[in-house]
């Protein structure tokens, strides 16, 4: 009898705990991916100010290589480099400041093919582009609101404003707008 009660209690605890633990792991992966991007962006900006030179941040299909170059469609990682000629393409002679291998795919990038930083730390805004750039990280849960009474999304978003400041957010309204403003989203 005692064994039956113990097994029943264990089944209830596992039934409640395992799904919550799975979401905890997923949340950690998304937060980690967004923070990886944020660290590389902050490094690019800080190096521009420290060196008084233009730097750039971009996606790369070979971020773990000393010959890493920019690739707008890449999801393997990011690089930050001293962009001496200001063309947002890393040349062999341009110093690699930081590289980061990403372990999570980005669902959506908006205006993030290349983020350039000026020596004053401000972002280079190319004519015709919006002042802010965004990236959305999500998993199979999509960008839906977390059902906990907050305005948080399951997804994570990174925003870079024209002043060069980058930040991570979980706010559903922002992420929904960046991911297509109500258009159905298919996440990896």
Feature annotation, model-predicted:
Residues 16-42, 46, 50, 54, ...:
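N-terminal helix-rich module
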């Amino acid at each position: 009898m005692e064994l039956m009660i113990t097994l029943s209690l264990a089944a209830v605890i596992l039934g409640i705990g395992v799904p919550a633990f799975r979401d905890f792991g997923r949340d950690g992966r998304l937060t980690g991916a967004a923070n990886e991007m944020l660290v590389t962006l902050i490094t690019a900006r800080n190096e521009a100010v420290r060196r008084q030179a233009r730097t750039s941040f971009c996606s790369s299909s070979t971020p773990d290589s000393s010959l890493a170059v920019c690739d707008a469609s890449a999801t393997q990682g990011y690089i930050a480099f001293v962009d001496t000629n200001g063309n947002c393409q890393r040349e062999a002679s341009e110093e690699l400041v930081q590289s980061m291998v990403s372990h999570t795919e980005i669902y959506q990038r908006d205006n993030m093919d290349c983020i350039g930083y000026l020596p004053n730390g401000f972002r280079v805004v190319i004519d015709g582009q919006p002042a802010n750039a965004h990236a959305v990280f999500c998993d199979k849960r999509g960008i839906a609101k977390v059902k906990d009474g907050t305005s948080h999304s399951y997804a994570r978003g990174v925003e870079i404003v024209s002043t060069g400041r980058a930040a991570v957010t979980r706010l559903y309204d922002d992420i929904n707008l960046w991911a297509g403003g109500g258009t159905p989203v298919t996440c990896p």
